[in-house]
Amino acid sequence: MGAIDTETKAYLSNPEHFCDVFNFWLYKGRQVICVDDLKELDTTAIALPYGVDAKEPIQKFRDVLKLYTAMQDNRAIYLMLGIEAQTETHYAMPVRNMLYDAMSYTKQIAEAAVSYRKGEEKLPKAEYLSGFRREDRLMPVITLTISFSPEPWDGSTSLHEMLAVDDNEILQYVADYKLNLLTPHDIADEDFDKFRSEFGTVLECVKHRQDDDMKWMEGKERFKGVTRQTASLIKTVTGFNLDLSEEGDVVNMVNAWENGLNKARNDARAEGRNECRRDMMTAIRMIKENKPTKVIREQTGLSEQNLIELRSML
């Protein structure tokens, strides 16, 4: 797993950030899902193969998966919420997420079957073979893909879009799977205010990653003090040359940006001076070896006037 994958997964595993993502996606920023309503779930999913030729089980690992419990009309409502982070377009994402969701449903049925077989109640034959009772219900699974690219998602967003047929008479009999997709490119600048955690700040930086200046950052209070973890993630996923040497747990993004640019300019000047010095030393050595002027110029990039001045000094 790469550095970006590791860092984004750790950041999204934070319950505060996780809640913020789904409150934005499901409720347009309304604070419905709370940290206390979440429970960590095992991100490992195993799908048992079917058929006589079946061999090894399929094992997949989700990025983040949590159980959401809420009360609605005096009864408990359960949702399984999963997040998949992508730094680039995954052109098979609808099938990939469909598999994750199917394995989550399969696991629920398998767990129900185990509990019934351990229980004392004798089930009717059909329910016993199914491992599932007629009145049983599954917990819904919602998987959200989050893009960390400033570019628009140019892949399929549904299973039907991936199929090699566009005949509606056929497609109406083919089950579809729609991708839940959150991309910074498609978020209006004013909608980043709907995020209550710093995750919105991360996505806004991703959206403007290719901008030539920082005007989009000016005048926004949230950029004046972000946690070091958030600043580090922004630097990782955007490639911004941020200077995070400032002490303390809070980073002023505007200062970090400006200091990073100044440091880059100074480093470039220093490197330019060092490179010029190296070229001069090479030219002096080649002059002493009586190398032709044309060869010296080609290797060092120095002008003919530079070489005349060097020769006069030797």
Regions found by a protein language model. Give the residues of each.
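Accessory alpha/beta interaction modules
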Residues: 1-193
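Short, charged alpha-helical interaction segments and adjacent helix-coil junctions
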Residues: 77-87, 182, 197-314
